[in-house]
Amino acid sequence: GSCCSLRCKVDIILKNTLNMKQITLHVYQSIDGCPVPSDKHFDAAVDASGCVLIDEETYLRIYLNHLGWPITAKETLVVTNGCIDLTENERVKFIQKDAVAELKRMKEDGDGTVVAYGEEIGALLLDNGLADEITVTTVPVLVGGGEKALECGLHDGGAWIVRSNKVQVDGKMRTVYGKV
């Protein structure tokens, strides 16, 4: 009867959750919360992921810093308002219309992991409840200025828990937060 149908509904919910892509937002910040460059841990996360999700500003910064596109083994998704394709021969896809709906579709389309990086993409993911995990790496420096490494406009009401917290050999603090 009703117990079996409840169990079936729970199983379906769990299967749907397990078959969704997991989006992990990587944030690199100074002690005072300002953005700092990513490190080898981020490179390893990119290598282990199914694809990379970034914003337009991050795309341009990566392209200009490397004088080309360094992420060739993975598909990179760039959320943008305009057409800024500097990498037409690489595995880069631009999301220009209704990014939230497109990201929700992508998230529901199978399993795997997506690594996200960039201040604007972080705000988009957090404001729309799309991030499953946040990995914050705090570098022991003071940068100063008004720019923050992680900004979001809306509070989604969801709770986050610390999954791990570790001091790295180089003095950086890496904290992984997960949704409750």
Predicted regions and their residues:
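Cysteine-centered motifs
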Residues: C3-C4, C8
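Enzymes that bind and transform nitrogen-containing heteroaromatic metabolites
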Residues: L14-V180
